[in-house]
Amino acid sequence: MKRVILFAALVCSSPVKAQDPSARADDFGKGIGPILQEYCYDCHGRKKNKGKVKLTDYGSWADLEKNPELIEKMIEALGKNEMPPEEEKQPSGDQRELMLLELEKAFKNAMAHSKLVVPLRLRRMNRFEYGNAVRDLFDLKSWVYSINDRIIRDHNNYFRPETGKMPKVARVGNRIMGLQQLLENRLLGVMAFPKDPPAENGFNNRGDHLSLTPTLMESFLELSRSVVNAENFDKNCQTWNDLFQDPSQKPSTTGFGSITADKSAARRSTGLTLSAWIRPSKVTEKWQTIVRREDSWRRQLLAIGGTGGTWGIWMGAGIEGRYVEFGAPVKPNALGDGKWHHVAGTFDGKQMSLYVDGKQVGRKAIVGKLYTESKETMQIGSYQNEPFHGDLNDVRLFRTGLSKLQIEEIADGKQDVAKEEMVGSWKRNDDVKPELKQPIEIIAHERIRKLLLRAFRSPADAKTLKLYTEYFDKQYKESGDFTKSMKDVVSGALASPRFIMVHNKASDASPNHASFNLATRLSFFLWSSIPDDGLLVLAEKGKLQDPEVLEGQVDRMLNDRRVKNFCDSFAPQWLKINNLVSASPDFKTHRNYYFGGDDKISYKRGMHMMLEPLLNFETVFIENRPIMELVDSDFTYRSHLLEEWYQGRAATYSINVNLRDIEFTRTPLKDRRFGGVITTGAVMVMTSGPFRSLPITRGSWVSSVIFNDPPEPPPDDVPDLKADDSTLQKEGLTVRQKLNQHSEDSRCAGCHKKIDPLGFALENYDLLGRWRDKYRTGLKVDASGLLFGKHAFKDVVGFKDAVLAEKDLFAKAFTKHLLSYALGRELTVVDRIAVDEIAKASEKDNYKLRDIIKHTVIHPIFNQKIKR
């Protein structure tokens, strides 16, 4: 069978070139035709018409190539040994191999002749994307609204893709629900987002589910007004001075500023020193940015906060082609006492050192050359959701690593220390008086132009720009209130289809509209948000579609912390993890599954369990591990509560145990019954019923999620299985034996043959996700089976081996999920070649997750360089 996969891959990787059907007529009659006649016609045309497939209608390649959907189904059924059924006469290995090869050729030929083109469907943002887009547009320090799509709450800054490593400890909590949502840092008084339709066998960014009706347009207008008029919007908006602040008035002091380094920093740099005076108003576990230049692995930063169990001061820099970070512990109350403190970080090519009030608090030997070529600015006190709380002043940037003595002198208040080495500085000046060099209207018009560029993801055409600027002029003339007039303009932009619609066409005002379209697709795929300035600049220059530039941007974006949005959105939907919310083991029988009082359900353990597979996914993502580790891995993340649970010794905790802020520790695994996402308690519980595990549901989950092959729903008149404990004990049967009786029904046999082995492989896990060797009836669990009719296994470890033996099939299935998410639509038969090509390109690096993402982006189906 390995030869089949190899030959099929070679066929799929060859150029799409149509063959003359008449030249292949004899091939059909002498090759695949007789094989179909001998093994397939009885069930599909001659005597029966199973699956509504009548193969006798196709007597030539020309006939068959008119139905590429059928060809695809035939390839999948033959490849998985699903056809012919095992009880029927089977073709030889050579015959099966010939059929697969010829059908692959036919499929390629059909696609070459096909006129089918699947355009990117026009769709609106969903709730998750809208919140991210508004937050990024205004660089908000808070969320726009509380949202359950974001399951994991990060409490110790664990998600840091730029490091390429997940920490030993991740302090996290689950999404908050009910009244607890009111406590989350969010804009106050924002109206509810129009309800998104649920995703069934897909993702909630699918264009066929996300339309825009006149009623929705009215809702979005009300929503946009409530955003800019939220009572805490002004203080949370970090673009306030650049957009809303009256230019004739003193700038607001809610933000800080930035430093643009002198060019000599790149020419004559021997190191780096970041120095600042700080007065925190509060200390938090999350990082607080003092100064940061964001440029992928080339970033430079100085911050306070906690990560990996250490709270203190942190310095980071790009050294020798990689990002290096070092933190030194400092007692939080030493900096949070309401007084001014001097902090600094230095790197001299040999060592990174950290200082507080002139005293060295930590050092680490790091040898290498500092990267200095970045053109990005140093942001003061602000980076995404890591703002500085309190006051900053006298921030200095040096092109060399200063000595201990020089740091002591700065901490003592000296102003001219190493002045010749200083390449940038920033000081707060509360006495700055603005000097208007242009009329206020001209300043406002330029602000609006920049706003629309970011909001609409492309330059606004002259007519559109005039519409918004004239509206501002009218509002400002009537009210004389600059801020209110600008908010009216902004709320209109946020309600515009140009903002709300994701796959809208970029304005023809730019000759590079194709690049702007690509920037939008890319940012919504990886960040679930609008493009940043870096993407827009490249789009404006028409460079984004250049392969090397595009690859570089993908690397940058995958190392940006906004990529957490991808993990928060794709992973839970792929795993269908939200099904765990409604899973409810019987309260009386399984009381210890619930936290709370003796007579009420307060909190389910499932809400805690679901963090394990999501953290495992993030580990594979951040560390760019092979996706096979999502099936079987030698690590997992567990809290002490989850560890107790798996060992069957969990106590009944009251609800006051801290479940929204708890440590998950990276745990090595030697027992292969655990590891990966399939056998986590989360998946086992959500695929069970109130009283027992459900092998059919589990098998359906594996088929849908792991192999992207969801089974057809059962007929409406199928009788209940009646497999409760009392019935099974009375009949002396296991669930498996009972199900075998049920599967004798011809209407049920086909699906059960496919999903039953997948579900029974997991039967050693009870409905609570814990291991068992016997059922409660005392009968022994039988988890043996046969995967795709060729991989026999005795238990779940053997099942994992069987899945890994089909890693190419799993990789293609995963790629289908990923591509559907990336394109925001259901895949069709036209997309099969693209899936094969993306998977084939990722194979050489053993299907590493980030590599699959990168190959998806650079493939023509995503960047739309060509149309198939």
Where are these regions (language model features)?
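Short proline/glycine- and polar residue-rich coil/turn motifs
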Residues: 62-65, 333-337, 369-372
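Low-complexity, glycine/serine/threonine/alanine-rich intrinsically disordered linker
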Residues: 19-51, 65-73, 77-82, 86-269, ...
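Short, aromatic/His-centered strand-loop micro-motif at the edge of beta-sheets
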Residues: 314-342
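Hydrophobic h-region of N-terminal signal peptides that target proteins for export
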Residues: 5-18
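Short tryptophan-centered beta-strand motifs in secreted/extracellular beta-sheet-rich domains
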Residues: 338-347, 354
